[in-house]
Amino acid sequence: MSRVRFDLDTLKRLAQFAAQRSSEDRIPQVAGSLTFTTMLSLVPLATVAFALFTAFPIFASFQMSLQIFLADHLMPAQLNSQIFNYLNQFASKAKGLTTIGMIFLFVTAVMTMMTVESAFNVIWRVRKARPIAQRILVYWAIITLGPILIGVSLSISSYLFTQSMTFTAAQRMTPVIEWALAGAALPLTAAAFTILYVYLPNCRVEWRDAVIGGVTAAIAFELAKRGFGYYVRRIPTYTAVYGAFAAVPLFLLWMYLCWFITLAGAMIASALPAIRIGQFHRPTFEGSNLFDSLELLARLSEARDAGKRGYTVPELSRMLRRDMGTTINLLEKLEEIEWIARLQEDGARPHFLLLANPAQITVERLFGLFVIDRAELGYQLELASTRVDGEMLLAALENDKLKVTLAALLTARAAARAAQAAENESGTSSMPHQAA
């Protein structure tokens, strides 16, 4: 019974953790923002991509394969014909633009991808984005080579599928084969989500976490597509109100669902390391960052004294019993003041080392870093609108006891442990005499 209770408590804390992460990452709000951005950049993206197929006639068949695949699998059948007709019309008109106009379209497409990358960096708690030159090169490769490679792959898949259908035309297919053929798009969708989660954030993402997030997002995407298609077909509310214009609001709603599923899958992939090590339910409190930063510095100090090369983020998260997002936030702030440094080796996770002398690391500095920003507080107290005396308040915050160092705290803790061990040992040795 206790095991069941433990599992239920764990599931409850896990649900609270998921709700907290969703609130912190602002998944619904970011999905709405990306929906609006996508509507503005959809024509530029389609124009840049389809212009490549037009410039090289050899790729014309690949373009048809890509359009057919997107029409069948990207959105419900009730919307794809109208939406792709609109896109083709807009893209064909955009081909007559001048060079400046095409540059503007490309910039718009790049800005969309930058928005998506920024959203992923927020979800993975990454503060430092890629250099702008590297980002533009990656985006250009995705925009130009992506449609061609996908078109080639789909053309080959279409050919193989046609050959298999011809081979089995005279035979009666079993329901298992029919189900397998109908779900052939699911692995491609899962692979696309997985690659997106691995390479788009500016951090190292484990493939196993990205695969779980990608498969979850792909399944949710297929279910949403079928459910949304059923809603449009059976409950024609938008058609009755908007008439022929109904495709636009329905497409907006579908784009919002797509982005919500994409971001939710990213949130799952980013939260899996914390869930896997079990550090997702420790409560935070006012001043917990101060305590955790001291504990983190103490661990790095012990590692340096032992001759170790420091610890990685997962190792520190496990020691602090905190999620990786909180640990990364602490490390970044301590790295900014040059108390710690990261050691990056090829293909490995970075290790963090202690640079500062523990005898010079004071609680007062950490108090100002994680609890009260005294510089900002002093500025606010100088404003004419304040009703409290700034000098008295700042003087009250001046406490010599906050000048205690990390070395003193470590020494005091070691002495307390030694005294406790000696007391336990003396108590154990006196037990036989008392029994006698």
UniProtKB/Swiss-Prot annotation:
Keywords: Cell inner membrane, Cell membrane, Membrane, Transmembrane, Transmembrane helix. It is a multi-pass membrane protein. Its main location: membrane. It is found in: Cell inner membrane. The keyword Electron transport does not apply. InterPro entries: UPF0761_bac, Virul_fac_BrkB. GO terms for cellular component: plasma membrane. Belongs to the UPF0761 family. This is UPF0761 membrane protein Bxeno_A3061.
